[in-house]
Amino acid sequence: LQENYITHNPVSLIRQKSRYLQKIQQARVTRKLNDRQWSILIDEIESRCAKEPLYERHLFIFSAFYLLGCRISELADTQDRQPVMSDFYQDSNHLWWFRTVGKGNKAREIAVPDAMLKSLKRYRRYIGAPGLPSPRDHCPIIPKQKGDGGIGTRQLRKIVQVGFDCAIERLAAQGQHDEAMAMRHATVHWLRHTAISKDVQHRPREHVRDDAGHQSVQVTDRYIEIDLQARHASARTKTLNTDNKETI
């Protein structure tokens, strides 16, 4: 029998391929908006609200994604659930929460910040509803402009894309073409990533985990990014002595 011999080490080839895949993954677009993109987005929508009240709905939707860290299925009507205004509720300590059902049909409550309450009041004025929701307010959170019920995921994606397009247009007009080009890849889910990435910079991880509906803190940790300059600055003062005195 004639034997065939392998001329290359297969384990070595697998390792080389693995390193190559890692480089490809690292080069992928970061799936969140940076501070500049987000600032332009909100500023542009707010400025349009003054001219066209229709953009009040856009402003509320982006506020909810950013301040609550919601998934699209937690704001839009689906076959399984229809979010209503009374999902915003006040507990016995006068704290406001947003009740929702997320991934894996898991119910949770999201802490509602003051900025979200302000946005909710503003939006309710726009749709002709008084003050903050009552426990008996079963109106859709984002009602259709025509017909009954709330908007679905398809319509919600379209509204978000309009907001993205507004920001892209403004970035391009300001000559920030790289920022505009990067934002063309944005999807609705980027808003959740943007929200959580910002949240972990200021809040305890456990709090972010529970609000985001993550199964573990390890999932939340994926959103933590360390600024390289801050990282280097914190390392510069390390010494060999426990009393931090320089010996070399």
Predicted regions and their residues:
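Basic, Lys/Arg- and aromatic-enriched nucleic-acid-binding interface segment
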Residues: 39-72
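C-terminal secondary-structure termini that scaffold catalytic or DNA-interacting sites
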Residues: 237-248
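Short, basic (Lys/Arg/His-rich) helix/loop patches that form interaction surfaces
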Residues: 50, 157-210
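Conserved tyrosine-mediated DNA breakage-rejoining catalytic core shared by Y-recombinases
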Residues: 77-122, 128
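Catalytic-site neighborhood detector that most strongly recognizes the C-terminal catalytic loop/helix
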Residues: 212-237
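Flexible interdomain linker/hinge and immediately adjacent N-terminus
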Residues: 5-43, 145-149
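N-terminal DNA-binding recognition helix of tyrosine site-specific recombinases/integrases
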Residues: 1-14, 70-73, 166-170
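Active-site/catalytic core of tyrosine-dependent DNA strand-transfer enzymes
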Residues: 113-182
